[in-house]
Amino acid sequence: MTNPVLNPALPAMAAAPVAATPSAVGSAGIVAPVFLRFDEPLPLASGQTLNGYELAIETYGTLNAQRTNAVLVCHALNASHHVAGVSADNPKDVGWWDNMVGPGKPVDTNRYFVIGVNNLGSCFGSTGPASINPATGRPWGAAFPVLTVEDWVRAQARVADHFGIERFAAVMGGSLGGMQALSWAITCPQRVANCVVVASTPRLSAQNIGFNEVARRAIITDPDFHGGDYYAHGTVPGRGLSVARMIGHITYLSDDDMAEKFGRTRREPAADGAYRYGYDVEFEVESYLRYQGEKFSRYFDANTYLLITRALDYFDPARATGGDLARALAPATADFLLVSFSTDWRFPPERSREMVRALLKNGSPVTYAEIDAPHGHDAFLLDDARYHAVVRGYYERIARELGLNGAVAPEGNSA
């Protein structure tokens, strides 16, 4: 077991009790992150080694005495450890899956102890390209090692060790988070009782790799990128990162959803309705995408975007089994819940059905739901009653099996 330590240089809130304090029914309450430092070197898939790193985490609910009620939530590309509740330092910062996790919600924190971990390489508190490289005293920048989904799982496992959690009641995630959950089930089968994979895929298609490459080129060719060492130049490749986000955002929405939201609505058309015959914003959808891109470029790190999209590209567990997904999933002993959405063209339902067929071939217990929803890939983040009913029902079944039908009394869990 790896023994992490809290970073003493971090603000006092980093040493606060891990369990969130509920402030209202249905809310995970006001939460603050905890920063765990791991000094044991982490071997990476690339052959490199990360000698010491920090992970930002948040938790919700209470770990029971048997340590059997823990749920790990893995995040997608631009999310973080802040899964639910309200940030202590920003009352407007609500967790990215707050509609899913909390008291009385599908993942009920009256029963479960939920952990959110900010992945290595991210820019929300865990060690990443913007962190100081102890060997140079300067930001890692382009020298930060390329990571894989499997690397993230190995790092997350050390968080489980820290809490003394031998086996998660469930590991879950949507999109890229679903890939991590799947990797957990394959690489750490004895530590995962249930695997919940939402709006995900066992590998990226050529089209998806193509989208990621176009986004990366937008960043890399930005004059302010400076080969990834823009920190030293005091610049931010904001134009490239903004375009990358615009490209990605289009893939998260369905055609029908965009048609309903924007259609061909004009942005401040001329009095006579004529086109402006220029290259500034003409349509509402253009204004929306520019806004999303510019907002994203103000809070996300460009090197992190490169790193995470490449990790997406590399995820392909069946690569080691000659493309045989059933063989790749054979080590898994967990029960599975897979959920897909009808209009998700980024990771379409057929990719989930492919995983279901492979799991059934192996004799794995599988529950599968395909939700008819108009919102595209981003549907996994939304409060859809049918979707949430499926997840709620699955977690209620886990609770019955574990005897978690009552609320877990707080015991002052801390990092």
Curated annotation (Swiss-Prot):
- Keywords on this record? Acyltransferase, Amino-acid biosynthesis, Cytoplasm, Methionine biosynthesis, Transferase
Name the family: Belongs to the AB hydrolase superfamily. MetX family.
Which is a GO BP term held by this UniProt record? homoserine metabolic process
Family matches, as NCBIfam families: homoserO_Ac_trn, PRK00175.1
Functionally, this protein is described as follows: Transfers a succinyl group from succinyl-CoA to L-homoserine, forming succinyl-L-homoserine.
Q: What EC number(s) does this enzyme carry?
A: 2.3.1.46
Q: Where in the cell is it found?
A: Cytoplasm
**Does Acyltransferase count among this protein's keywords?**
yes
Q: Which Pfam families match?
A: Abhydrolase_1
What does the entry list under GO cellular component? cytoplasm
- Catalytic residue list: 175 (nucleophile), 344, 377
Domain named AB hydrolase-1: residues = 69-383
Protein's UniProt name: Homoserine O-succinyltransferase
Q: Where does substrate bind?
A: 245, 378
- Name the reaction it catalyses: L-homoserine + succinyl-CoA = O-succinyl-L-homoserine + CoA
User: In what pathway does it function?
Assistant: Amino-acid biosynthesis; L-methionine biosynthesis via de novo pathway; O-succinyl-L-homoserine from L-homoserine: step 1/1
**Main EC class the enzyme belongs to:** transferase
Q: How does it assemble?
A: Homodimer.
Q: What is its main location?
A: cytoplasm
Q: Where is this site: Important for acyl-CoA specificity?
A: 346
UniProt-listed HAMAP family: MetX_acyltransf
- Any one GO molecular function term: homoserine O-acetyltransferase activity
Keyword Iron set for record:
no
